[in-house]
Amino acid sequence: TYMLAYDAPYLDDQTRKGIASGLEQCRKIARLPRTEVIDRSREGSPGTVGMELEDGLFYLNAGYCGKSVKTLLDIGAEYTSIDQSLADELGVRIFQDSLRMSPASYMKLGILDSLQIGSITLKNEICCVFPDGLAARNREATADSGITRIRAMLGISTLRKLSALTVDVEHGTITFDTGKQPQTGIANFMLKDNIPYLWLELNGIPAMMHWDTGMNAKPRLSGKFYAEHASSLPELGPVRKGSEITAAGAAEYRYHALGGICAKIGSREVILPEVRVVFDTEDMHTAEVPGYDGQMNNIV
């Protein structure tokens, strides 16, 4: 997700708004039809698809213009995306070949005649088209290393057209809903300004944490801790150094490692083996849960 994800290291607010504005302008210039969402699920039978969990990432099969393609669920990505060879194979119409995605990168924009996920079909869905080989679990790997090549990613541009998303790791399924099905349980997954968040508690502290899944690293949760929460956390240990890959390259950060933190999502609880409290300012810390792999089932 290093090219398409929204987070401070990737896109600032001005760039993100510029992308949205540019996309709308492209629609008008190209006179593109609006996306139509068709839900063929029957009452009591929601649109559920099988899911594979590989190295902490969620994969499903989606239909692109009638072709089934293994797809990465990338809720950190601004747009649903496919690689150039798949776009050529499907005959995707390219209507913009230089959309700025970050200060140093450009992508093509195309339109899919149809995108099917379970019983839901989206007609005339806009997608990004990226160069072949750009999306891979390890960009340094060679072609014969057996590394997973990612040809398609399901992003926020598609998910925001739906009303609910349920990830059930225990049964290996993802359910997509347009609002046709009656909702059960308490929703704790939401989009705010196209950024995905989860509601949860950490050691009893209510938190709305940014939930990111993507191709560059295992899914993770991140959110803010303030000084007033210090009494609810274990004593901070020594400062350690960490690094992560961003669009600009490797970025280092300082953090305190905490163990034994209880995370509660809905009625489910799990003890997290490690929470990294990253120093931001004198009175604020960012809590990150590295490698969170959806072990709490039924995240809605």
List the predicted regions and their residue ranges:
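Pepsin/retropepsin-fold aspartyl endopeptidases
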Residues: 1-300
